[in-house]
């Protein structure tokens, strides 16, 4: 192994070969560095269960039995007997527990021993979906005397609470794992909380892979039914080739795949992207007449640079890459469309290639791209052109005939209410949300609390007499805010027993190592109201619903008004505490990364795989930070993360508060949707967000801080979208896609040109309340695809981009000690309305805030 040390020992990186170290040094322009050759030997191996081992690792995993009927105590005993013989020989200790239909296992040993054993365990046909809950170093063995201790859940305790709770948490965790970003999943595999990890700078090769003219496919009404199948095929092809070449999928964005590779995998990255094009070509040739898969082409841009792998957001999170090189990659991918090439990459990527591949490429010239002062030099592989216009014509002329796809999209409104997926947040407008001290002063919202609050409000004060009396069970987990003594637990028990008996509620409360796990059973409205009161209790935090579903009969008899199970109940099998605690912590972390629709559907007792693809009309919102490239090009990666994290938190708070659903967090860009009949709430969220940015600038006006230059534009548009889950190769995406998804980005972009921070299209304006429609919007001189656009009136919602750019230049100049350049102040443009559709009575309506500011009429 070779170690490269530079920056006077502040930066260290290891490599397997000397060539890799030298290549990294040259590509990173490192001048003063030292290289060392190191021989690494394990301190101990095959310790035979000894507690003296020093390089130990502990691994905990969850899996699902392929044949639950045969997993009785005798079956487990035989499994443990065989495992004990094997593990004693290689020095592995641990335990195995079964709670139908899930296996929970912990193994301890050296890295070499665990890697060998876990590879065999993963291939065992007696279980499937093997998911690691924790994997990290340990100072000593917890189960040194157990080479494989086994226990069936029925042998540990007859108490129904443990079996029920383990099943509910494990089921939800297992189902949500495939929706988790791989980077966040890798953190969980190491036993780390992704949200608690500091940003990690790295050098990466980044790509954006576009599904060519996917917007045209969505716009063609004859192809709407096949949109979900097209997306699912695209996801599977990208996952297979990216991960198969040593890369990582960062995210999917409506027909776009963002992926990255380490710099020593640059050639593999380009080969994988070429293979994606070849796989799609093969699929096109194999399709039956009428299949939209025959219209799938890919186009990609690749760039190399410094980026930061980090967690962004708290209420809804994204574990992704941030950095200026991400924006440049996107521009190169857009340039590929103009140059009619399927793969375009920058000069920086060319420098990382070997001599053999360099001989295959050809220059594609120097081109100016948006957001960069200097032109970029790009290269391509020789080959046939990819004419986007030709693809568009094929899509427009395409007719599916009698072809029927495997994933048909159905109209949301045509489904019975009971079968509609929970794609909207039903929280009543203006409902206060529980808050606790924490990052940003907010508590991460529980996935079901919005719907539960609505039910509670509708139920009224006398729920037990007149509300919904359907027998319902609800399980939640939470963390104690302070250590709980026996007296504290006794006080909780006394209060709960008296209160719950009056409302016919039974259940169980577990307290294990600071973790509360409670199940409530009773009339639905009574359970919901009690749960909402419990959430307000200051003695716990991070309250998260795990399961909520109707019951045929009570699991806990009526005489058990509330049963407490503490460490004493678990004394017969101490490892159960570790399993329950780790499972609950991992579930809490995972829930913030999974789409809200999936979480709501899952915790209501459904299988997410049964989510039906639907189409419906929504108000789409898109926002990003103005002049983000200029703001961040001279900022540190930590500052970039701080800007994005602050902005994303503000966006998710405003959107969720107004009943919207966050779709994607894309660097400094956030997209979301609102119900089609709730356009006013979308405008309110946009106003709240822009106000936050203004207040943020005011807070840092006297400080040389990048947050003092943060502003944003917001675009709102209305249109039909398809909502479907896509992918089957270990990664699942819940996608919200439609022509409006791309159009709303154009609406957001014109905010810089027209001088309004919030711009809406006419379809959105038609859905606003009469007061806002008649007195709160102003026509703009711009139109998007023939749709007139309007700005939200008011001096407080005007956007002066020139002032923002001057502020950014002044900030960078002041921080570098330079004198800022003085530019002659340009006259403000006189915006005039271009001829378009005029409504009867428009000429007589005028906004007070707009009068005297611009000589234009208010719609």
UniProtKB/Swiss-Prot annotation:
Cofactor(s) this protein requires: FAD
Main location: other
Domain BLUF: start-end pairs: 56-149, 471-563
Enzyme Commission code(s) on record: 4.6.1.1
SMART domains in alphabetical order: BLUF (SM01034)
Enzyme class: lyase
Gene3D superfamilies for the chain: 3.30.70.100, Nucleotide cyclase
A GO term for molecular function: FAD binding
Domain (Guanylate cyclase) ranges: 205-333, 619-748
Family annotation (InterPro entries): A/G_cyclase, Acylphosphatase-like_dom_sf, Adenylyl/Guanylyl_Cyclase_3/4, BLUF_domain, Nucleotide_cyclase
Subcellular location(s) per record: Cell projection, Cilium, Flagellum
Skewed-composition ranges (Basic and acidic residues): 815-831
CDD domains referenced in this protein's UniProt entry, alphabetically: CHD
Highest taxon of the lineage: Eukaryota
Reaction catalysed by this enzyme: ATP = 3',5'-cyclic AMP + diphosphate
UniProt KW keywords: ATP-binding, cAMP biosynthesis, Cell projection, Chromophore, Cilium, FAD, Flagellum, Flavoprotein, Lyase, Nucleotide-binding, Photoreceptor protein, Receptor, Repeat, Sensory transduction
Region feature Disordered, mapped onto this chain: 420-443, 813-859
Pfam families noted in UniProt: BLUF
GO terms of biological process kind: cAMP biosynthetic process
UniProt record similarity statement: Belongs to the adenylyl cyclase class-4/guanylyl cyclase family.
Function, as annotated: Acts as a blue light photoreceptor for the step-up photophobic response. Mediates photoavoidance.
The protein's assembly and partners: Heterotetramer of two alpha and two beta subunits.
Record-given protein name: Photoactivated adenylate cyclase subunit beta
Biological source species: Euglena gracilis
């Amino acid at each position: 192994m070779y170690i490269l040390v530079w920056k006077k020992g502040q930066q260290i990186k290891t490599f397997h070969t000397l060539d890799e170290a030298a290549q990294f040094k040259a590509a990173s322009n490192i001048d003063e560095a030292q290289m060392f050759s190191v021989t690494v030997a394990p301190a101990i191996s095959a310790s035979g269960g000894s507690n003296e081992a020093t390089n130990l690792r502990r691994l905990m995993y969850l899996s699902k039995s392929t044949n639950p009927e045969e997993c009785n105590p005798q079956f487990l005993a035989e499994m443990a007997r065989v495992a004990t013989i094997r593990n004693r020989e290689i020095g592995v200790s641990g335990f195995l527990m079964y709670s139908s239909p899930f296996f929970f296992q912990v193994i301890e040993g050296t890295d070499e021993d665990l890697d060998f054993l876990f590879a065999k365990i993963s291939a065992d046909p007696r279980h499937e979906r093997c998911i690691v809950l924790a994997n990290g170093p340990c100072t000593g063995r917890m189960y040194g005397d157990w080479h494989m201790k086994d226990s069936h859940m029925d042998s540990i305790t007859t108490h129904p609470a443990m079996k029920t709770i383990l099943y509910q948490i494990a089921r939800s965790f297992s189902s949500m794992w495939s929706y988790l970003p791989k980077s966040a999943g890798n953190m969980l595999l190491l036993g780390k909380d992704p949200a608690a990890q500091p940003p990690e700078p790295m050098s990466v090769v980044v790509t954006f892979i576009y599904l060519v003219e996917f917007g045209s496919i969505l716009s063609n009404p004859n192809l709407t039914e096949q949109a979900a199948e097209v997306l699912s095929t695209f996801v599977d092809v990208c996952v297979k080739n990216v991960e198969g070449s040593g890369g990582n999928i960062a995210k999917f964005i409506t027909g776009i795949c963002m992926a990255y590779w380490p710099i020593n995998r640059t050639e593999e990255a380009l080969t994988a992207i070429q293979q994606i094009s070849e796989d799609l070509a093969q699929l096109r040739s194999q399709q039956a007449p009428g299949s939209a898969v025959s219209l799938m082409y890919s186009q990609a841009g690749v760039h190399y640079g410094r980026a930061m792998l980090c967690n962004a957001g708290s209420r809804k999170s994204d574990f992704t890459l941030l950095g200026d090189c991400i924006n440049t990659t996107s521009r190169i991918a857009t340039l590929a469309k103009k140059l009619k090439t399927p793969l375009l990459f920058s000069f920086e990527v060319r420098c990382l290639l070997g001599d053999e591949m360099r001989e295959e490429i050809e220059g594609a010239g120097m081109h100016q791209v948006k957001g960069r002062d200097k032109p970029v030099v790009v290269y391509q592989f020789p080959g046939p052109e990819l004419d986007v216009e030709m693809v568009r014509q094929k899509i427009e002329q395409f007719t599916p005939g009698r072809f029927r796809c495997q994933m048909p999209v159905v109209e949301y409104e045509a489904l019975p209410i009971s079968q509609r997926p929970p794609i909207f947040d039903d929280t009543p407008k203006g409902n206060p949300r529980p808050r606790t001290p924490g990052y940003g002063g907010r508590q991460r919202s529980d996935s079901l609390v919005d719907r539960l609050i609505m039910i509670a409000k509708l139920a009224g004060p006398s729920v037990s007499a007149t509300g919904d009396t359907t027998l319902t069970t609800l399980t939640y987990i939470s963390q104690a805010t302070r250590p709980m003594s026996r007296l504290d637990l006794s006080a909780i028990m006394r209060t709960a027993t008296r209160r719950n008996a009056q409302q016919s509620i039974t259940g169980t409360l577990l307290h294990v190592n600071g973790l509360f796990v409670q199940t409530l059973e009773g009339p639905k409205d009574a359970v919901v109201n009690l749960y909402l009161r419990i959430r307000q209790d200051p003695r716990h935090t991070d309250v998260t619903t795990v399961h909520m579903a109707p019951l045929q009969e009570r699991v806990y008899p009526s005489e058990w008004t509330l049963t407490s199970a503490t460490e004493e109940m678990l004394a017969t099998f101490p490892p159960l505490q570790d399993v329950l605690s780790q499972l609950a912590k991992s579930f809490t972390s995972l829930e913030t990364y999974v789409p809200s629709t999936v979480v709501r559907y899952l915790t209501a007792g459904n299988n997410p795989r049964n989510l039906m693809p639907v189409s419906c009309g929504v108000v789409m919102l898109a926002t990003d930070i103005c002049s983000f490239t200029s703001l961040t090009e001279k900022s540190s990666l930590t500052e970039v993360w701080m800007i994005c994290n602050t902005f994303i938190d503000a966006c998710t708070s405003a959107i969720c508060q107004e009943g919207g659903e966050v779709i994607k967090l894309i660097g400094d860009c956030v997209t979301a949707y609102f119900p089609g009949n709730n356009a006013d709430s979308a405008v309110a969220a946009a106003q709240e967000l822009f106000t936050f940015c203004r207040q943020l600038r005011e807070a840092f006006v006297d400080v040389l801080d990048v947050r003092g230059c943060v502003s944003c534009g917001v675009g709102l548009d209305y249109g039909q979208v398809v909502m479907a889950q896509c992918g089957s190769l270990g990664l699942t995406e819940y996608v919200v896609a439609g022509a409006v998804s791309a159009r709303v980005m154009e609406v957001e972009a014109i905010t810089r040109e027209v001088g309004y921070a919030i711009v809406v299209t006419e379809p959105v304006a038609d859905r606003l309340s009469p007061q806002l429609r008649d007195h709160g919007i102003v026509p703009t001189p711009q139109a998007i695809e023939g749709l007139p656009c309007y700005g939200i009136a008011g001096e407080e919602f005007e956007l002066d981009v020139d002032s923002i750019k001057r502020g950014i230049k002044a900030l960078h100049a002041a921080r570098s000690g330079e004198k800022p350049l003085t530019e002659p102040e340009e006259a403000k443009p006189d915006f005039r309305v271009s001829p378009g559709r005029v409504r009867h009575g428009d000429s007589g309506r005028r906004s007070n805030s707009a009068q005297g500011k611009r000589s234009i009429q208010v719609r």
